[in-house]
């Protein structure tokens, strides 16, 4: 069949059906969302949980959510801006930070569901594949599916670092090693050591050493926050190891205590009370009377 030009006449516009709002805005992939939210009919009211990972310029967001008619409901959430509490004060958007955020989410969720002692995950971070083993004499492992949104699922992407952290934290997420750093597409082999190096930010440490030797000025500029906080290339791995232990020890969200009340800014005049309005009228009358007396005199 040859090319048929669409005739945009009255009948075309009369029958035209617009796409969903979030599709028009380019925010939601409904093809993927349908498959991530629709549950098997035999499971009745059991929701299908999703691990939502979103990246921004300054933050990494990890959420566990499920879909309802009125909208999605968030069960638990963790953010990379919480990591300074655990000793990670710099590099809050790199692969290692994504892993820590996923680990924090998993431990926080399991503690919320009182499954943290039953499913501890793995404490040996070797970068290799790990899957949670379910217990026969207790509740099953928490199962969810990775929701990447509109992000490109390239090998070594940070979204898979967050997923790996959640899996090591004790969540049951179907996955393979094909998208982790260290997977070679040509030989179809996976090098777990390369993945481990990314989890502990060895690639950043190596770049720090190279830049410090060859371009000291650029090193001072690019790693100014590392220098300010006294973080060296040799101490990065130890920093992340301590952070993993601290996250497992206390995954609870820290309550924000406001020490001082915010200063309210007002851009319009405050509304006068009845007594203030009457007093204002009296003042206007008095000033007007005074002007009349001055002109007569």
Curated annotation (Swiss-Prot):
UniProt keyword Transcription, yes or no: no
SUPFAM superfamilies: Translational machinery components (SSF53137)
Cell location: Cytoplasm; Nucleus
Domain of life of the source: Eukaryota
Matching CDD domains: Ribosomal_L18_L5e
Pfam families hit by this protein: Ribosomal_L18_c (PF14204), Ribosomal_L5e (PF17144)
Any one Gene Ontology molecular-function term assigned to this protein's record: structural constituent of ribosome
GO BP: ribosomal large subunit assembly; translation
InterPro entries reported for this sequence: Rbsml_uL18_euk, Ribosomal_uL18_C_euk
Membrane-crossing segments per the record: none
A GO CC annotation given for this chain: nucleus
Keyword tags: Cytoplasm, Nucleus, Ribonucleoprotein, Ribosomal protein, RNA-binding, rRNA-binding
Function according to Swiss-Prot or TrEMBL: Component of the ribosome, a large ribonucleoprotein complex responsible for the synthesis of proteins in the cell. The small ribosomal subunit (SSU) binds messenger RNAs (mRNAs) and translates the encoded message by selecting cognate aminoacyl-transfer RNA (tRNA) molecules. The large subunit (LSU) contains the ribosomal catalytic site termed the peptidyl transferase center (PTC), which catalyzes the formation of peptide bonds, thereby polymerizing the amino acids delivered by tRNAs into a polypeptide chain.
Entry's family note: Belongs to the universal ribosomal protein uL18 family.
Subunit structure: Component of the large ribosomal subunit (LSU).
Protein's name according to its UniProt entry: Large ribosomal subunit protein uL18
UniProt source species: Lysiphlebus testaceipes
């Amino acid at each position: 069949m040859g090319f048929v030009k669409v005739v945009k006449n009255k009948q075309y516009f009369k029958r035209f059906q617009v796409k969903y709002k979030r599709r028009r805005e380019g925010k939601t992939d409904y093809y993927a969302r349908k498959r991530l939210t629709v549950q098997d009919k035999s499971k009745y009211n059991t929701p299908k949980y999703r691990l939502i990972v979103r990246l921004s310029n300054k933050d990494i967001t990890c959420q566990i959510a499920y879909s309802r008619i009125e909208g999605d409901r968030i069960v638990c959430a963790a953010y990379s801006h919480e990591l300074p509490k655990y000793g990670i004060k710099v590099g809050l958007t790199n692969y290692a930070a994504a892993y820590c955020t996923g680990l924090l989410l998993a431990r926080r969720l399991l503690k919320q569901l009182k499954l943290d002692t039953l499913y501890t995950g793995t404490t040996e971070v070797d970068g290799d594949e790990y899957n949670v083993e379910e217990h026969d004499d207790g509740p099953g492992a928490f199962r969810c599916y990775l929701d990447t949104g509109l992000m490109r699922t390239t090998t070594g992407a940070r979204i898979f670092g967050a997923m790996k952290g959640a899996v090591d934290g004790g969540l049951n997420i179907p996955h393979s090693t094909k998208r982790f750093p260290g997977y070679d597409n040509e030989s179809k082999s996976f090098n777990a050591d390369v993945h481990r190096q990314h989890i502990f930010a060895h690639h950043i440490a190596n770049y720090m050493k190279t830049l410090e030797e060859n371009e000291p000025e650029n090193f001072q500029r690019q790693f100014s926050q590392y220098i300010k906080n006294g973080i060296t290339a040799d101490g990065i791995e130890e920093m992340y190891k301590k952070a993993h232990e601290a996250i497992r020890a206390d995954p609870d969200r820290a309550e924000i205590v406001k020490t001082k009340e915010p200063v309210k800014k007002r851009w319009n005049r405050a509304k006068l009370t009845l007594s203030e309005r009457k007093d204002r009228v009296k003042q206007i009358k008095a000033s007007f009377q005074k002007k009349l007396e001055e002109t007569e005199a």
